[in-house]
Amino acid sequence: MCIRDRNEKFMSFVEGVAKTILATNPADVEALKEEKFDGTDRTVTETLNDLVLSIGENMKVRRFERMDGIVSTYIHGGGSVGVMVGFDVADESKAATAEFDAMGKNVAMQIAAMSPAYLDEASVPAEVVEHEKTILAAQMKEDPKMASKPEAVLAKIAAGKMGKYYKENCLVDQEFVRSDLFQGDVKGYVASVAKELGTEIKLNGFIRMMKGDGLEKREENFAEEIAKQING
């Protein structure tokens, strides 16, 4: 069997698994394995075993994520990174427009390229905030330039540094990578499109999955790859 045939069989299986997840909404991977594979009377596990025997490659379903509602997606590099991003739209009819579709894809590409850890400041766990503040306090204590500064000034500096942390790690606060379309942060970009469409749009969550997550893998610069893709 040639590589092309193996790839086509694998992609057909992946598509079938995705359709099965959409149709049955399994609670987890173990539940998914026992569901009937899309369009057949065989389970996902049985179908996977057939595929393994057919193409001679050992495989297993490790994870999946599902989002409901208004969702935009982006797949990078033939499946190396996949993104889903959810929106609340006051006038849901606007979600069917070309402008919304482009905005959703651009935000999903942002997530693929910049890998934000959180949606917004409120999404950052309290323990993470405290950990970052502890690190900042230790750094400032070791900095001779900070020794003579009043507490109020130190507090302001610390707040500024935390703001930088949020800007780097929270999607809505990140600088929008498509500066050719909008200069500002992601929430500003979304707000600008919402204004153009005459409705309210709010980001409500995202999922970013990278091929090989949890496995040993080589480092890749997705921000650079996506920038090249944007610039042609």
Identify the function of each model-found stretch:
Residues R4-G232:
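N-terminal assembly/interaction segments in proteins that build large macromolecular machines
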